[in-house]
Amino acid sequence: MTRTAGAPMGCQRPSRFWGLGCPKIYHEAEDTLVVDPVDNREYFFSHFEPFWANRLFPCFDQPDLKASFSVTVEAPDDWQIISNTLATKTGNGDLSRHEFARSRRFSTYLFALVGGPFAVFEDRRARIPSRLFSTQSMSAYVDAENIFEVTRQGFDFYGKYFGIPYPFGKYDQIFVPHFNAGAMENVAAVVIKEDAYLYRETPLPSRMQKRANTILHEMAHMWFGDIVTMRWWNDLWLNESFATFMSYLAQVEGTPDKHAWQQFSSSMKNWAYWQDQLPTTHPIETRVEDTLSTFDNFDGITYGKGASVLKQLAFYVGSEAFRKGVSSYLKKHAWKNAERKDFTDAIGQAAGMNLDGWTKLWLQKSGINTLVADYDVDAQGRISRFELLQGKGNGDAVLRPHRLQVALFHDREGKPGLEKTVTVNVTGERTAVDDLVGEPAPDFVYPNYGDHAYAKFYLDGNYSPLSA
């Protein structure tokens, strides 16, 4: 229902006016219903990011214009209709009427309307009403027990981490065909690509990990993106980078999967390393001139580097200060819009630090630094000097502050044995690490133990980034 000057204005939109899957690929046909080739059943689903809600109802599609929504849908009686709130269903012959409760305020791109003869799964153990939907032909492949378990774990972790209970009343995850994105964080009605996350065969652990990560990524958006939304598309990178970082953190700290950071390093971080060394590299933070340009820089810098830099920021300020800053940011701007500076200011305030300089070097400058350990050993076989050397690297070629862990290893019958770790704040070209002076000479030095830093690390002590 759209209100003009306070008066409700009803509107109807035949499905042929709707975008199918991703609105950039508009479905030109008499109808935009998805026909399942297995059983010829028909389904529809919306996807309005960044500015396509106006195809369904009159509105201004900008993230800083929030509204509440009240929806009524008439549909075939055997259909499920899903939107952002719970509905009351009443019968009317072959048609049923679905009246959805008025929603909280959120941006139009987060509105969802999905319908069809879906199979429905309900989690009877959940504190928050949770449902899964799939096409009938794929219902046999829905691992509801596992998906619901990850969902419950996510709610428990995020509720405690953010200090804000989940506010939307229900949580639906709808697996649909022909979806051109991996998933979409519509408020309380997450749409997920079925062929990417419903497995016909016994899945490898890596695929289970990926599905759990996607579930937790979209759930993180319920707080960071849906409750608090970017003021303009300039900060879409932060929306996605934060959800990416949080999904891996939630896996490690909120589920039995304690190896998710390794997956992050091999996938997201390596994607960032590759893209950041191309001639086309760009700063994490870029200006979006208009809505049509929203996804122009949607790449490994947006997701991979952005998430890697947030991981570095959490280590730089301390994990608890980071958590408190995030919680403060969400509580202060709940149901409103905010900008990246609001976020980094909240983190800085919680940590007692001014992050303006850090922000300029990490978010507004492109490229990747190089780091290498350089040290001397005396006649007694002990370290007499230890430094970390930083090179400017490519892109904008600037030196950046880093906080990392240096680890010393010794050969133990052909296997590396960890002897000592120290935390180091790297500044400038040379950073002395006096805590390692006097230690027995290592067989191997790893300057990024724990993978907290984002840089190229050279493991050969004969290489000097200062002369590169």
Identify the residue ranges that each predicted region occupies.
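Extended Gly/Ser/Thr-rich low-complexity repeat segments
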Residues: 13, 108-122, 400-404, 448-449
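Beta-strand-rich binding/interaction modules
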Residues: 355-356, 366-447
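Hydrophobic alpha-helical and helix-loop surface patches within well-folded domains
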Residues: 1, 52, 100, 131-395
